């Protein structure tokens, strides 16, 4: 082989190699946007959470998608199954009972939000002393809010419980009822809507807000601010340390979110962090 031919072959081979390198070098794909899907209760709490989503987008580039629920039956199952990444709609006593009843062993508390005090509402009385003998009173029927409501009634001097510290008390634990109040358990989601038919309803802020009631403005009596029922953010053991979950927690625990909560609940909301 002549020297000129050898140089020509070498040059062609080099060109092919360089061309191949150029073709293989592709632009890097843009990183997928950080996303999180969070379950919330409909009403004012959802509106408060939307501010957390705004903070998350501005500070961390996190896209937050909320899924609304009208009751507490499904949000924990949705997180456990992976349909949601997290939820922000309950307190620890409720989570403990729900997880135990449904065997949701992969749920974990990752942060606190607010304490939303429980309150007693009425269209017939302005003061608890106006409650007549045999008056109709409704309390939530889910285990934790039921006990919470009964403890609140005891603090108003209306009843006495077997154990005032038992968060899972039921109407069967009432040992004194001097006014012979007719205390009935109803579904948590309908307690506030029963006000036309009863003398007093003990309702949590989620459902009170859905019918336009505010604990401080409309409550006959309100739970103390030192309540142990701080609301929480819940995720799973497999995603609790993920950037999306941690950034959402930081976004929720901000002054912007607290200010929005005060707009909706006034003095009826207390920081839990």
Curated annotation (Swiss-Prot):
GO terms for cellular component: cell outer membrane; plasma membrane. PROSITE patterns: PROKAR_LIPOPROTEIN. One of its GO terms (biological process) is D-methionine transmembrane transport. Residues 1-20 form the signal peptide. A lipid is attached at residue 21 (N-palmitoyl cysteine). It comes from Haemophilus influenzae (strain ATCC 51907 / DSM 11121 / KW20 / Rd). InterPro entries: Lipoprotein_NlpA. It is found in: Cell outer membrane. This is Probable D-methionine-binding lipoprotein MetQ. This protein is a component of a D-methionine permease, a binding protein-dependent, ATP-driven transport system. CDD domains: PBP2_lipoprotein_IlpA_like (cd13598). The gene is metQ. It holds the Pfam family Lipoprotein_9. It is a lipid-anchor. Belongs to the NlpA lipoprotein family. A lipid is attached at residue 21 (S-diacylglycerol cysteine).
């Amino acid at each position: 082989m002549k020297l000129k031919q050898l140089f020509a072959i070498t040059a062609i081979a080099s060109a092919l190699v360089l061309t191949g390198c150029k073709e293989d070098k592709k632009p890097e794909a843009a990183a997928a946007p950080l996303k999180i899907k969070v379950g919330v209760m409909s009403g004012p709490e959802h509106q408060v959470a939307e501010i957390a989503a705004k903070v998350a987008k501005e500070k961390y580039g996190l896209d937050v998608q909320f899924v609304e629920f009208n009751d507490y039956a499904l949000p924990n199952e949705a997180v456990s199954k992976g349909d949601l990444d997290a939820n922000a709609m309950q307190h620890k006593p409720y989570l403990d009972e729900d997880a135990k009843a449904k065997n949701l062993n992969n749920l974990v508390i990752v942060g606190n939000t607010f304490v939303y005090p429980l309150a007693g509402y009425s269209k017939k009385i302005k003061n608890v002393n106006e409650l007549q003998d045999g008056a109709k009173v409704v309390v939530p029927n889910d285990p934790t809010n039921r006990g919470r409501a009964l403890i609140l009634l005891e603090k108003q001097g209306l009843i006495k419980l077997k154990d005032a510290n038992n968060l899972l008390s039921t109407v069967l634990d009432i040992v004194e009822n001097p006014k012979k109040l007719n205390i009935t358990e109803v579904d948590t989601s309908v307690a506030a809507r029963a006000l036309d038919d009863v003398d007093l309803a003990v309702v949590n802020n989620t459902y009170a807000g859905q019918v336009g009631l505010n604990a401080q403005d409309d409550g006959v009596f309100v739970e103390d601010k030192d309540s142990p029922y701080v609301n929480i953010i819940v995720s799973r053991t497999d995603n609790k340390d993920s950037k999306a979950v941690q950034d959402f927690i930081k976004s929720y625990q901000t002054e912007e979110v607290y200010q929005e909560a005060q707009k909706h609940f006034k003095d009826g909301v207390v920081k839990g962090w």
